[in-house]
Design a protein with these regions (language model features):
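Short solvent-exposed loop/turn micro-motifs enriched in small/polar/acidic residues
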Residues: 58-59, 68, 113-114, 124-126, ...
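Bacterial N-terminal signal peptides that target proteins for export
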Residues: 1-9
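The feature marks short-to-medium sequence segments in extracytoplasmic or secretory-pathway proteins
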Residues: 86-122
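Extracellular/periplasmic metallocenter environments
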Residues: 29, 34-36, 82-83, 118-162
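Bacterial N-terminal signal peptides
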Residues: 8-18
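N-terminal edge beta-strand
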Residues: 25-72
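Beta-strand cores of secreted/periplasmic/IMS beta-sandwich domains, seen most often
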Residues: 26-27, 63-92, 129-143
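Sec/Tat signal peptide C-region and signal peptidase I cleavage site
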Residues: 19-24
Length: 162
């Protein structure tokens, strides 16, 4: 208490507030959406696909903010679908110009080869989940790897600055 009285309560509060924000993880809100299970799923909308036209996407991810600082990042994920299970996987893009490795027969990304950094898996409609990971600076891709969803455009770019 002597230290607080010497510094003044206002100064002590500023120091405490500054200290707590240094240790806090960046928080990212992720909404997983689609236009309904009865909507036809287009293909050819995977990241870095030639002639990519995202206006055809019937599902996707809304990410806010899309840029954070390196360190601990907490993703708060909500499946806003009314009838479809979705997930969110964090992938590091070693080369942002290259597509992720894909298993055609399974209609999904090869998570082991792609550099999976963590996931909130299989969220039922209306459900939420969270994931906290330590991310280094670079480009990342958030994807839903339920078969067919990634190829239908269910992904979002994400940047981590130094």
């Amino acid at each position: 208490m002597n230290t607080i009285s010497k510094l003044g309560i206002g100064t002590a509060m500023l120091i405490a507030a500054g200290t707590s924000s240094v240790w806090a993880a960046s928080r990212v809100q992720v909404s997983l959406w689609d236009k309904g299970a009865s909507t036809e799923m287009p293909m050819g909308l995977a990241y870095a696909a030639p002639g990519l036209d995202m206006t055809k996407a019937t599902m996707g991810m809304k990410v806010s903010p899309g840029v954070v600082k390196a360190g601990k990042v907490t993703f708060k994920v909500k499946n806003d679908s009314k009838d479809t299970v979705h997930e969110m996987i964090v992938m590091f893009l070693a080369d942002p110009k290259k597509p992720l490795p894909y298993i055609d027969a399974e209609n999904r990304v090869d998570e082991d080869k792609a550099g999976d950094k963590g996931e909130v898996s299989e969220l039922d409609p209306g459900k939420s989940g969270s994931l906290t990971v330590d991310l280094k600076a670079g480009k990342y891709l958030l994807i839903c790897n339920v078969p067919g969803h990634y190829g239908a455009g269910m992904w979002a770019e994400f940047t981590v600055n130094p």
